């Protein structure tokens, strides 16, 4: 049963963090589309590792957006504490998730093989 609770907490944090990034943060450096792909909260609720995909063709823009997200982690943590009632408000650690880009690359390779 604790695994089920952990999954619910992860999904709730994922939904709220996505909402905060899309609607609450007013940082002009956030120019690309950002998607929260996964959230892993530790069992003691001290840390939340947030995996994000940043959709941009420019590598420099991705870095700027990721830096802006990292600098907004305190603000996101504060808003999460107001919205979600848990014992400890977790420290947010952002991780860049390139699995979507990798999947698109693999799909392109498969298409090239099919075309030959």
From Swiss-Prot:
Molecular function per GO: ribosomal small subunit binding
Keywords: Cytoplasm, Ribosome biogenesis
Domain of life: Bacteria
Statement: the UniProt record of this protein carries the keyword Cytoplasm: yes
Matches recorded under SUPFAM superfamilies: Ribosome-binding factor A, RbfA (SSF89919)
Pfam entry (one): RBFA
Main location: cytoplasm
InterPro entries assigned: KH_dom-like_a/b, RbfA, RbfA_dom_sf
Any GO BP: maturation of SSU-rRNA
The keyword Metal-binding is assigned to this record: no
GO cellular component, one term: cytosol
Location in or out of the cell: Cytoplasm
Subunit structure: Monomer. Binds 30S ribosomal subunits, but not 50S ribosomal subunits or 70S ribosomes.
NCBIfam families cross-referenced by the UniProt entry: rbfA
Biological function: One of several proteins that assist in the late maturation steps of the functional core of the 30S ribosomal subunit. Associates with free 30S ribosomal subunits (but not with 30S subunits that are part of 70S ribosomes or polysomes). Required for efficient processing of 16S rRNA. May interact with the 5'-terminal helix region of 16S rRNA.
Homology family: Belongs to the RbfA family.
Protein name: Ribosome-binding factor A
């Amino acid at each position: 049963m604790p695994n089920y609770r952990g999954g619910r907490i992860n999904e709730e944090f994922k939904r709220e963090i996505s909402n905060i990034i899309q609607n609450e943060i007013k940082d002009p450096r956030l120019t690309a589309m950002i998607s929260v792909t996964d959230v892993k909260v530790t069992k003691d609720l001290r840390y939340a590792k947030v995996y994000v995909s940043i959709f941009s063709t420019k590598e420099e823009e991705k870095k700027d957006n990721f830096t802006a997200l990292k600098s907004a982690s305190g603000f996101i943590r504060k808003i999460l504490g107001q919205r979600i009632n848990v014992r400890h408000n977790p420290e947010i650690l952002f991780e860049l998730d390139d699995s979507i880009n990798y999947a698109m690359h693999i799909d392109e390779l498969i298409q090239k093989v099919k075309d030959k």
